[in-house]
Amino acid sequence: MRNNKNQMYIIKIFIAIAMITGIIFLYLFYSSLTTSKLKETSNMDDSLKIKFTLIEQQGKKFDSTNLQGYLSLIYFGTTYSLYDNQALKRVEDIIKILKRENILLQVVFITLDPEHDTSEVLKKYLEKIDSNFIGLTGRVQDIEQLAQQFKVFYTSKIFDVKTNEYALQHSNFVYLISSDGKILSHYYLGS
């Protein structure tokens, strides 16, 4: 039994290292290219350039132009999900490692439940994880539209009578966004 736990721990470490290596590789690769070379060699389509306007945790407007000039990681979730909390902790661990290598990323958490996750709720939630993370909320239809752009699958919010809590099932990916607002890649954060 203990041996299985050790094996699972080692597997999780290897997965985390692979994710970090992939992010570092993509950052170094894309940052070394000039804009013209990027257009010539990239197989990314302009349709993957995201556009949105939402509200950040301070109550101010935040749109896709705020991503320009920064390599960003975007994660979709809810503030009341233990699983999302763990996923953001993994992202935070990756960010700490990258900071030691002088690779700076902007992290954006976008709620899938804007009716619950208001700016104030996001602010309190992200202060507990990392106050540098940006939390975004907005109108339900704006969140739905953005989730469709990212191909995020999620269900309607349901109340679980067993746990006396809300639940919202969703896909669990973090998206790497270029400094010009294009989706470069996505990474599964595991279960």
From Swiss-Prot:
The source's domain of life comes to Bacteria
Read off the InterPro entries from this record. SCO1/SenC, Thioredoxin-like_sf
Q: Name one Pfam family in it.
A: SCO1-SenC
Q: Which residues form a coiled coil?
A: none
Q: What SUPFAM superfamilies does this protein map onto? A: Thioredoxin-like
Family from the record:
Belongs to the SCO1/2 family.
Under PANTHER family, the record lists: ELECTRON TRANSPORT PROTIN SCO1/SENC FAMILY MEMBER (PTHR12151), LINALOOL DEHYDRATASE_ISOMERASE DOMAIN-CONTAINING PROTEIN (PTHR12151:SF25)
- Protein name, entry field: SCO2-like protein RP031
Instruction: State the species of origin.
Output: Rickettsia prowazekii (strain Madrid E)
Q: What is this organism's lineage?
A: Bacteria, Pseudomonadati, Pseudomonadota, Alphaproteobacteria, Rickettsiales
